[in-house]
Each structure stands twice: as structure tokens, then as C-alpha cells.
UniProtKB/Swiss-Prot annotation:
Coiled coil: none annotated. Belongs to the enoyl-CoA hydratase/isomerase family. MenB subfamily. This is 1,4-dihydroxy-2-naphthoyl-CoA synthase. GO terms for biological process: menaquinone biosynthetic process. Its EC number is 4.1.3.36. Hydrogencarbonate binds at Q154, T155, G156. The record marks Y97, Y258 as: Important for catalysis. It comes from Haemophilus influenzae (strain ATCC 51907 / DSM 11121 / KW20 / Rd). Its cofactor is hydrogencarbonate. The gene is menB. One of its GO terms (molecular function) is 1,4-dihydroxy-2-naphthoyl-CoA synthase activity. It is an enzyme of class 4 (lyase). It catalyses: 2-succinylbenzoyl-CoA + H(+) = 1,4-dihydroxy-2-naphthoyl-CoA + H2O. Gene3D superfamilies: 2-enoyl-CoA Hydratase, Chain A, domain 1, Lyase 2-enoyl-coa Hydratase, Chain A, domain 2.
């Protein structure tokens, strides 16, 4: 018998389209606090080019700073691919992927940082291929919900490429050093169950249930404390994000301190041109 609470979690979602002005992505927001960014290049298995990444970053920033949004979903158009990485047809000879003006970019690295530093949970909703740079994007998301037809793997050494940043180091954190080396050195592909078994994804569902299950997970998170989730994400990232991770964690502590009477006493004293009185605040051991 289904729990009555599940009825609310599985209720139909109402998406509002915010895709105007975008060519490579679709962007939607739900009426209950979920943003969804969809890579919309199914003709190339949702491979990204510089324009795609620019649009993802713009939509992502909008979702981050929208106080009505609590969770962000990243996905690909259709059932054949989440994202197959960088579009090799626009990969140039001078260190990146060429935009329409001929400038070479590796701006997907900026988008990776956006995912890691965003205080809101980011959920990868994966159907079909999550390969190469697309595989790294799903790994960097906080959670991954996979369809049964999902395929995971790296292709870098086959196409003269690699991700020596989070694509290597964070993968090793997820699956262990030996398995990470296997994935990168052999360039094999793994089905959804294999990905689940090695800790690359959180759950596997039939493709027909993929969005419904993803929305359920998002709604469960939306029921919880946003400050707690924000600080937990920063804490979970800090051990492998170096100084940037510590900065994010410390920034959250500063934000919380600003909300306290003690923090506000310092501000008020400065603005009122008087000495602050911190004597009333506890000095806990």
C-alpha cells in the first residue's frame, strides 16, 4: 500500500518555460521550487559546444539566485543521451572548442566550478549516454538519478583528451583509485546497474519513471532545511576542493554569523559610531 505522503511527492509537476533566448538548451522552473536545465542538441547526443556551456551557465546562475528555487536538475533532451561531452567537430587546434567567432574555449571547466560551488543541490537526470565530459558533469552533480538505459564512461584517451581535474580526482573519491584508473585507461562503457554498484549513481529506474522519480527526490530535499543542506554540501566538498572548498565552507559560516545578534552588534556599533558591546554574548567552551 502506497504511503499517502508519496502521493504528494509523485504529484504531477507544473513546468513554466523560460527557454526564450536560448538555442542550445531548454530551461524550465516548476511551481514548487525546481529548476530544470536541458541540453538540447540531440542530433549530436547532446554534446556541448561553447555556446551550450554559456547558456547552461546563464540559466544556472538564474536558478542559483532565484530564491524560489531550491534544487536544480541537469539533463539532456530525449532518451538517447544525457551528454556525450565536448563536440569534437568544433574542437580546435589551440586548446579548446571554437565558438562562432573562432575563439577557443574550455568554458565547461567554469561550469564545473559553478556546480560545485552552488549552495543548492544539483541533480543529474540521466538517460542514455553520459560519456566523456558529460560523464564528468553528472559526477559533479550532488545526486544522479539514472534510467535503466543509461550508459556511463570516459573516452578521453581515445580522442586525445582527458580531464585531470575533478574528472580524475573526484572519480577516484567516488569509485576508488583502481576503478577510476580502469575507467580512464581502458575507456570502457558501463550500464546503469554497474554504475549503481560502483557508487556512480544513486538509483536506477525505468526510463518512463525517470522524471517522476527525479522530481520526487527534489521534493524530498525541498522539505528539509536549506541552510543545513547548503552547509552540508560545502562540508562534503571541502575535503577535495582545496582552498576553494574551505572558502565556500567559511563563507557559509560568515553568512550564518551575519544573521546572529552578535554579528549584528558589530555592524550596528560601527554604523552608530560607538564601541561594540560583546559582553552579553556567551563564550561557550
Amino acid at each position: 500500500m502506497q504511503n499517502p505522503k508519496d502521493d504528494v511527492l509523485y504529484a504531477p509537476v507544473e513546468w513554466i518555460d523560460h527557454s526564450e533566448g536560448y538555442s542550445d538548451i531548454r530551461y524550465h522552473k516548476s511551481t514548487d521550487g525546481i529548476a530544470k536545465i536541458t541540453i538540447n542538441r540531440p542530433e549530436v547526443r547532446n554534446a556541448f559546444r561553447p555556446q551550450t556551456v554559456k547558456e547552461m551557465m546563464t540559466a544556472f546562475s538564474d536558478a542559483r539566485f532565484d530564491e524560489n528555487i531550491g534544487v536544480i536538475v541537469l539533463t539532456g533532451e530525449g532518451e538517447k543521451a544525457f551528454c556525450s561531452g565536448g563536440d569534437q567537430k568544433v574542437r580546435g587546434d589551440y586548446g579548446g572548442y571554437k565558438d562562432d567567432s573562432g575563439v577557443h574555449h574550455l568554458n565547461v571547466l567554469d561550469f564545473q566550478r559553478d556546480i560545485r560551488s552552488c549552495p543548492k543541490p544539483v541533480v543529474a537526470m540521466v538517460a542514455g549516454y553520459a560519456i566523456g565530459g558529460g560523464h564528468v558533469l553528472h559526477m559533479l552533480c550532488d545526486l544522479t538519478i539514472a534510467a535503466e538505459n543509461a550508459i556511463f564512461g570516459q573516452t578521453g584517451p581515445k580522442v586525445g583528451s582527458f580531464d585531470g581535474g575533478w574528472g580524475a580526482s573526484y572519480m577516484a573519491r567516488l569509485v576508488g583509485q583502481k576503478k577510476a584508473r580502469e575507467i580512464w585507461f581502458l575507456c570502457r562503457q558501463y550500464n546503469a546497474q554497474e554504475a549503481l554498484d560502483m557508487g556512480l549513481v544513486n538509483t536506477v529506474v525505468p526510463y518512463a519513471d525517470l522524471e517522476k522519480e527525479t522530481v520526487r527526490w527534489c521534493r524530498e530535499m525541498l522539505r528539509n532545511s536549506p541552510i543545513a543542506i547548503r552547509c552540508l554540501k560545502a562540508a562534503l566538498n571541502a575535503d577535495c576542493d582545496g582552498q576553494a572548498g574551505l572558502q565556500e565552507l567559511a563563507g557559509n559560516a560568515t553568512m550564518l554569523f551575519y544573521m546572529t545578534e552578535e554579528g549584528q552588534e558589530g555592524r550596528n556599533a560601527f554604523n552608530e559610531k560607538r564601541a561594540p558591546d560583546f559582553s552579553k554574548f556567551r563564550r561557550n567552551p
